[in-house]
A protein has these predicted regions:
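Sec/Tat signal peptide C-region and signal peptidase I cleavage site
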Residues: 24-28
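Conserved C-terminal helix/tail region of periplasmic/extracytoplasmic solute-binding proteins
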Residues: 298-332
């Protein structure tokens, strides 16, 4: 054999082998070592998914680990996303808009529920009968969450300003405790704490408005979505499995909610009965709902003056991933 021919072809084979190795390495690097998600008592879908381990099952063959972190509210989930402590976080839609407007690079990619998860509550024997009666009163709410924004919108439509009341900033569970101990006059509650307070302490719903409850959004960091689009799809596929299971098994879902959140089955049933799991396809409907709700963020100086909230909302909502779950459904 010609020596030059041998050397040339040996070199080509070596380069081909290196190229193959690099290709394999690149493919391996295209998947993360770990997917980090939150779970939340206000998101029954996350509890069912965590309970059955369906995401772990789905990514096991890829060698990807799954890590779960408890979120006590939208504000916590958004803090974790901003700090890169989690890749996926469960929040209310308007809370996600507020966070994105203030610089948190997230994308909302899935609707895990359409809940009536917040309302204004007062103690069972309270003399307060209307929202107007709240003037000069102490009201607990968790800043940066749907209940807080619900409170601001409720005050506005009832002719009150934020300065007309004293807002006490407490996490959801602490707000419930403060209401039941008489330290505050009213509370912008969140399920399941709200349902627990109704059933166990007799707390009374003072003001309800389903339209002021924004959707439950699953958010992902922009960085994760860009680097690992296939894993975003895998997470949504797992969420879909959990959502469909809840629709088919409401009693069992209530029991899982009760066990995970450490609440009574009766409370869990109340929470699930006022939660709509029918439409996960994020898109136009959700943009329009958020555009209608967003002005309160500017009116209350929660975002910088001049912020283009329509652009923020359009940049936030990304239907491209959920469309792959059901091509015949239009999410745009």
């Amino acid at each position: 054999m010609d020596r030059r021919f041998f050397i040339k072809n040996t070199a080509l084979l070596t380069l081909a082998g290196l190229g193959s190795g690099l290709s394999l390495s690149a493919r391996a690097a295209a998947a993360p070592d770990e997917i980090r998600l939150d779970y939340a008592y206000y998101s029954p879908t996350s509890l069912v998914l965590k309970h059955f381990g369906w995401l772990e099952e789905q990514v096991k063959s890829s060698g990807i680990k799954v890590k779960w972190t408890l979120s006590q509210g939208s504000n916590r989930a958004l803090e974790y996303l901003s700090a890169n402590s989690i890749d996926f976080g469960s929040t209310a839609g308007l809370a996600a808009v507020l966070s994105r407007a203030n610089g948190n690079p997230i994308k909302s990619v899935y609707v895990y529920s359409r809940p009536e998860w917040t309302a204004l509550l007062v103690p069972k024997d309270s003399p307060i009968k209307t929202v107007a009666d709240l003037k000069g009163k102490k009201i607990a709410a968790t800043k940066g969450t749907d209940p807080y924004l619900f409170l601001l919108r409720t005050l506005k439509v009832n002719g009150l300003k934020k300065s007309d009341v004293e807002i006490v900033h407490l996490q959801h569970a602490d707000g419930r405790a403060a209401l039941e101990s008489g330290r505050i006059d009213a509370w912008a509650g969140l399920d399941p704490h709200m349902a627990s307070s109704e059933l166990q302490a007799g707390s009374r719903l003072l003001y309800r408005n389903v339209a002021f409850n924004t959707y439950g959004f699953l958010n992902v960091t922009e960085d994760f979505a860009k680097k690992y689009p296939d894993q975003v799809k895998q997470v949504l596929q797992a969420y879909e499995r959990a959502r469909l299971w809840i629709l088919a098994n409401p009693r069992e879902a209530s029991q899982i909610q009760a066990d995970e959140a450490k609440i009574s089955l009766a409370v869990a049933k109340v929470q699930l009965n006022r939660t709509d799991f029918s439409n996960p396809y994020i898109g136009r409907e959700h943009r329009e709902a958020l555009q209608a709700a967003a002005p309160i963020l500017l009116q209350e100086d929660l975002v910088k003056k001049g912020t283009d909230l329509n652009k923020v909302i359009n940049d936030l909502i990304d239907p491209s991933f959920v469309q792959t779950l059901a091509p015949k459904k239009s999410a745009a």
